[in-house]
């Protein structure tokens, strides 16, 4: 009951903040001297979204397809790499520094190279998403595996358990919190990463749509897409939270 009350209170606070921002935005564009050309009114953004929804929705499905494919590959690869590095100290010592160093290179800098190597199709976009989503999953899972209480693994080994049983009964369950925390980051990045990749070239997608309306100075449509991307990311993160509650019912506080 207490948890539900806190959740309702948080939702009301978030909704109130959004309403305040929208009101201030409307006042600034209506009475504050801010040019509606550069910063369109909230109602104009809504109208642009509704009027151009068929076009926006077709681009949206392209972006979501790229995002989900890249997310699936990135999460799968991150899980496999984390598992292999946990099983082998040699692999951990050899590849973990490389894994960390690889994240010091901005994805925006890598994207043009991927386009040059792979063209303007779907592959460079999926590859960029994989690069962005792979790291948080791999590192979070690996840290969770390494932080498992060694006494628990020793106890299972004393009872005749092998590596499979140790992962099944100890390491995988105890790594779920880290996994879902990283998964939320990966989910939100997958959509943003797809849009960034589409900015650099492509034929369809929300990023391509944004470039086209930018050239026409249709700022109302640009804002509409920005809010759509934010909404998609929030919905996906809420979906991950829902899956987490179902996968980890013992974490629910009544």
Feature-to-residue mapping (PLM):
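Transmembrane alpha-helical segments of polytopic membrane transport and secretion proteins
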Residues: 1-19, 238-254
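Periplasmic/extracellular loop-to-transmembrane helix junction in inner-membrane transport proteins
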Residues: 31-72
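Transmembrane-helix boundary motif in ABC transporter permease subunits
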Residues: 69-99, 116
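C-terminal transmembrane helix and the adjacent membrane-cytosol boundary/short C-terminal tail
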Residues: 89, 146, 177, 181, ...
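Generic hydrophobic transmembrane alpha-helix motif, especially the helices
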Residues: 100-136, 143-144
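Glycine-rich helix-loop "coupling/hinge" segments at transmembrane-helix boundaries
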Residues: 116, 192-229, 252-254
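Transmembrane alpha-helices
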Residues: 127, 131, 164-196, 236
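Short cytoplasmic-facing helical segments at TM-TM junctions of multi-pass membrane proteins
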Residues: 144-182, 210
């Amino acid at each position: 009951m207490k948890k539900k009350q806190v959740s309702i209170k948080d939702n009301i606070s978030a909704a109130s903040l959004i309403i305040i921002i929208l009101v201030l935005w409307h006042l600034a564009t209506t009475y504050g001297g801010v040019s509606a050309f550069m910063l369109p009114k909230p109602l104009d953004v809504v109208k642009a979204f509704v009027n151009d929804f068929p076009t926006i929705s077709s681009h949206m499905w392209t972006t979501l397809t790229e995002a989900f494919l890249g997310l699936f590959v990135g999460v799968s690869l991150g899980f496999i790499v984390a598992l292999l590095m946990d099983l082998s100290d040699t692999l951990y010592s050899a590849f973990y520094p490389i894994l960390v160093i690889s994240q010091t290179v901005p994805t925006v800098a890598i994207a043009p190279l991927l386009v040059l190597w792979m063209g303007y199709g779907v592959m460079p976009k999926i590859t960029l998403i994989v690069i962005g989503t792979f790291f948080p999953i791999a590192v979070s899972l690996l840290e969770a595996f390494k932080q498992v209480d060694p006494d628990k693994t020793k106890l299972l080994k004393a009872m005749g358990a092998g590596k499979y049983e140790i992962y099944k009964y100890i390491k995988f369950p105890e790594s779920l919190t880290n996994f879902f925390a990283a998964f939320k980051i990966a989910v939100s990045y997958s959509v943003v990463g797809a849009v960034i990749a589409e900015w650099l070239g492509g034929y369809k997608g929300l990023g391509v749509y944004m470039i086209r309306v930018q050239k026409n100075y249709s700022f109302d449509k640009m804002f509409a897409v920005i809010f759509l991307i934010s909404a998609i990311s929030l919905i996906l993160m809420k979906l991950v939270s829902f899956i987490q509650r179902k996968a980890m019912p013992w974490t629910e506080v009544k």
